[in-house]
Amino acid sequence: MIDEDISKIAETLSKEEFKLNNDERIINALERIATSLEIIAHNKIHNTKLKNNANPISSNNVFNSINNDSQYIENFLMKKGVTIKFVPEINSEINDVLYSLASFMGNNYSKISSVYKAIKSRLSSGESVKIDMKNFTQEEISYSCQFCHNLYELTFLDYYKYLKSPKYQIILAPNRIPLVINFLTGHWLESYVVYEIKKLINYFNIKKEVSFLLNPQICLPNGDDFELDILFSVDDNIYWIESKTSDYHHYVEKYSKVAKILNSENLHPYLLLTEVPQQTCNKLTNLFGMKVLNIENFSEFLFRELEQYKTHIIPEEAYNVENNENE
């Protein structure tokens, strides 16, 4: 009798436990459905903005005051036995608005990296993601929310919602148009580099000849095809900057070999990484003979590098690209 009662109690408890687990699953499912419905509702309104603002071209392009005659750089490459196969036109979609966004990302990367990587992981599917920020610092929460707000305003996010205390969560879904995918998967970092260069050229009021060659597709002397990220020259010096937002392991040696082919006292090759501490960057520099930089130190490094060409420093408000409408 006692055994039978124990068996019944155990069976009842088992059913209750299943019910609780099942209820929890139902609640979670309902939350996901509610989020999806909210996203769909927002998309109907937000996609109207997208159609009108997918390509908001600003008249104040950051290249306006730069001589973009890249002949000096091209001649240098040809003397090294390099054939230039194709040079794309400057991407008109990467206008001042996106350069400003790239600058925000680059200068605050450590504070927004968790949210950025969560967004990037959903670009292929467009699915929503819930980001728990309970362990974030207040600064990380603030900058992450600002980052998402900026993306949403530009229609880079189809959906964005911030849940305040006690949840401290961000729910978002990325837009999957080509401009967004291209920019957030890595082109933002190139844009950040170009933006910082331009800003410092203005800041130091550099009068030397300055030119850019962006994303040229080349053929090396051994017949291998290759694509360079950013080449820019100041006077007789040429700076070559490659940038990687993710796995760099398969590229460092390739870049090092190309640097040896292009070797010259006038060439300064650099590799910019986002996910690698400067201590590791220093080790890579010593190992491969190519200067490797962490994004946290890039702006300061570039400042010191371009300072040598300064004519005189002009007031900050005059070189701030975001606010200077007459460059």
Predicted regions and their residues:
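Extended alpha-helical segments
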Residues: 1-52
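Intrinsically disordered, low-complexity Ser/Thr/Pro/Gly-rich regulatory segments
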Residues: 30, 48-327
